């Protein structure tokens, strides 16, 4: 009986801690929005803010619809889709719905990282297409390789990781699954789009394009610090 009570108490505390971390990561969304809006020109503020809303609004539904199954379903390279069905997942004592929320906010974070790198030169409709791809394919598949128990986490004898490196891959605090994925996509997007109009003169020298509000940009940075460092304690 004592072990049962202790187990239930542990699961309850773990659930509270997981949801607290999810709320902190979600709180990073307004941080990203403020940073990006503050460092861009006032005429593009509405576009930047709307893209951050779209990341979460559409991304959360799409991730729930198909992304969660691809990330945590059975399979080595990619999981099996389970459309709006969470019954396949065993949370190990944690509620599956809570874990879905936890993963959803990380998916939104990976998507939002790209927004700032392509600010002021991306059509809203094309950004919506990108949001769909990262929410239902890019983040879930790369996440399945590690957090979903895919081939990078396969520690069985004879597996690729064990034969090649003698150990499995370890992702610390989403440094690869979240930030590296978002960063690489941002790099590719910025390279394809090129610089903002007016950034370089005819002589090739760069011109400063100051943001319209450094105050809200600084506030956004502090919000990001707050959300990231406190959620890092959980991860």
Give residue ranges: language-model regions.
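Hydrophobic alpha-helical transmembrane bundles of multi-pass membrane proteins
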Residues: 1-233
